[in-house]
Design a protein with these regions (language model features):
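Short secondary-structure junctions
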Residues: 174-184, 274-287
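Intrinsically disordered, low-complexity regulatory segments enriched in Ser/Thr/Pro
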Residues: 55-61, 298-321
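C-terminal capping/extension of enzyme domains
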Residues: 1-22, 133-145, 167-261, 315-316
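A polyanion-binding, active-site-adjacent surface
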Residues: 2-158, 164-170, 203-204
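Ser/Thr-rich, low-complexity intrinsically disordered terminal regions
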Residues: 283-304
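Amphipathic alpha-helical segments
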Residues: 258-279
């Protein structure tokens, strides 16, 4: 059988399981990439596995009327006029491409027939915590076997898992941290295929973290045709690890210096408004003070706001309504 015949046979049994369980759990379910694009003459270079679809709608029978629909991917993104029609513009794909770009392997995500985006389980929940429900958890454990079968059919050269306990930890019994405790880059093997676990690309990534993981993955991809030895890989990666630590420390130092400067600015402006201009305090809380300039009737006409809080360091002026 060719790969499309194998995928159709897989879809028959996967659809039977998911449609019944999704109806019982009242959960939506779907895949991501269009698997009908895969061919035997173009092997898949990279499979990217997320946790689960995050839309979180209830069960919708019309979305997948037959097993073949499961192969066509996220049908919402296929709708005419949808601005997210192009899978390459999805945030998690763009972020991953940026990460891999530091290792000059971002082009692995340029051809949907050469890479596959899927999920460890196809049940959709608004947040990952939706998988903690006992009945969903039981169904999730069974669903992983269909994901493993999909991996076995596609046989990608490399797999990247986004997230931890509900992704890579469900697929593999044991993993190794290739970069130690410096940055998350887990490694394991499933049926001879190298698997890497990184932080989910929907979360925050510092630039130096993206650079380290991207360059480390490039080196790993070059040698993972045989099992990777953790000790050897870590030693080979000391140059990029040291570069990461230096950049992280430099950034922390800059952030600390910036915080000190803002403390000075905040204190100076607060004192100037209060003592030099004689403005009255409108509102005051920790590291946030507002002063008002009264109109002819003594009402607060113009508000000057000074803020020196984490994530918000600003000076603002507004008219009181």
């Amino acid at each position: 059988m060719n790969i499309q015949e194998k995928l159709r046979a897989w879809a028959d049994v996967a659809y039977d399981f998911y449609s019944k369980e999704a109806y019982t759990l009242d959960l939506d379910f779907y895949t991501q990439s269009d698997l009908t694009l895969l061919t035997d003459d173009k092997p898949v270079e990279l499979m990217v596995i997320g946790i689960n679809p995050g839309h979180g709608r209830n069960y919708q029978e019309e979305r997948f009327a037959k097993p073949e629909d499961l192969l066509r991917g996220n049908c919402d993104f296929k709708k005419e006029g949808n601005p997210h029609l192009n899978i390459f513009e999805w945030h998690i794909v763009r972020r991953l491409r940026s990460i891999l770009g530091y290792g000059k392997i971002g082009d692995l995500l340029n051809d949907e027939s050469r890479f596959v985006l899927t999920n460890a389980t196809f049940f959709s929940t608004p947040k990952e915590t939706g998988l903690d429900d006992l009945k969903v958890k039981e169904a999730q454990k069974v669903s992983i076997e269909y994901t493993k079968k999909l991996i076995d059919i596609i046989r990608p050269k490399h797999i990247i898992c986004l997230g931890g306990k509900n992704c890579m930890n469900l697929l593999l019994d044991s993993t190794t941290r290739l970069l130690g405790d410096v940055v998350k880059l887990d490694y394991g093997v499933i049926d001879g295929i190298p698997v890497y676990g990184i932080e989910h690309t929907s979360s925050f990534w510092a630039r130096e973290q993206m650079e380290l993981v991207g360059k480390a993955l490039e080196r790993a991809f070059e040698q993972d045709h045989v099992p990777i030895d953790y000790g050897e890989f870590y030693n080979q990666s000391k140059d990029i690890i040291e570069s990461f630590i230096k950049k992280r420390n430099d950034r922390d130092e800059i952030e600390h210096e910036t915080a000190l400067r803002w403390e000075y600015i905040y204190a100076s402006l607060s004192n100037y408004c209060k003592y030099n201009l004689g403005l009255e305090v409108f509102e005051e809380s920790k590291d946030s003070t507002s002063f008002y300039i009264p109109d002819e009737e003594g009402k607060s006409d113009i508000i000057i706001s000074l803020v020196n809080q984490k994530g918000d360091k600003s000076v603002g002026v507004r008219y009181s309504i």
